[in-house]
Amino acid sequence: TSDSDVVGSIKTSTKLSKNVITHSINSISNRLNFIKNNRSNKNLSNQNINLDFGNPIFTSMYDASSISKKLNQSPLKNKLPEGWSMWNEGTISLSKILDDSTKKDIFSNNLTIGFDKKINENEIKGFAFQVGYSDIEVGKNGTGSDSLNYNFSIYRTRPLENNNYIESLFGIGLIKNDLTRVDGSNVLSGNRNDKQLFGSVNLNKPVKKNNFTLTPSAKIDFGYTFLDSFSEEGTNALRFPSQEIETGIASLGLKFDGLSNFN
């Protein structure tokens, strides 16, 4: 295999670990936003399964189909303890990436299932499980990886003084990678595990005036991934030491909600 395939495989593995954390945080953030936008509803269960075929026409056809509607129905939502709601968020995607002259075909799917309870109008607690699978092909010779990831998160929204409130989550996870590299007539393989910690803190301060509400927010997402040392099996095998990947994103936001009457 060419050097570009080796580099591409390493870059893809690093990107995968970051994407898993991002998807986990975003899934829970989407859930909390759904609850805020549907405060008056007694039933806060919500199912959200999406397919992305890498083609907007195919994706639109799926979204309008009966298959989409069936995937977004849950038989468990009426069997939960009183006060608890169930939600899910899932994606299935197919994509092609051309980077550093190396083509990468990526098939991935992720499913998050969560349960939460509304303690009062301003306080929520819950937990979520995520499982995902990725099949990545790098180049044209058969180099690639199969990855399976699991993680568990807890999350909470609680009020603070002066009408502030905070959203927080913390999670742990594991990614199991089966790696294959083709070098001429040699096929080399190996396994590598990634252990993850991640979290997010989002501080909000709603400001109400007349029929409008402005909500400034400050958010910090962070993640840490420890990659085990890795040795291939086969001729001309490569070896990699353990590695650490740290990620962090800080952002500021402003949400506007309002109701206007037009004559």
Task: Go through each PLM region and give its residues.
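Outer-membrane beta-barrel biogenesis signature
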Residues: 15-84
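Membrane translocator/pore-forming domains, dominated by Gram-negative outer-membrane beta-barrels
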Residues: 2-22, 26-29, 80-263
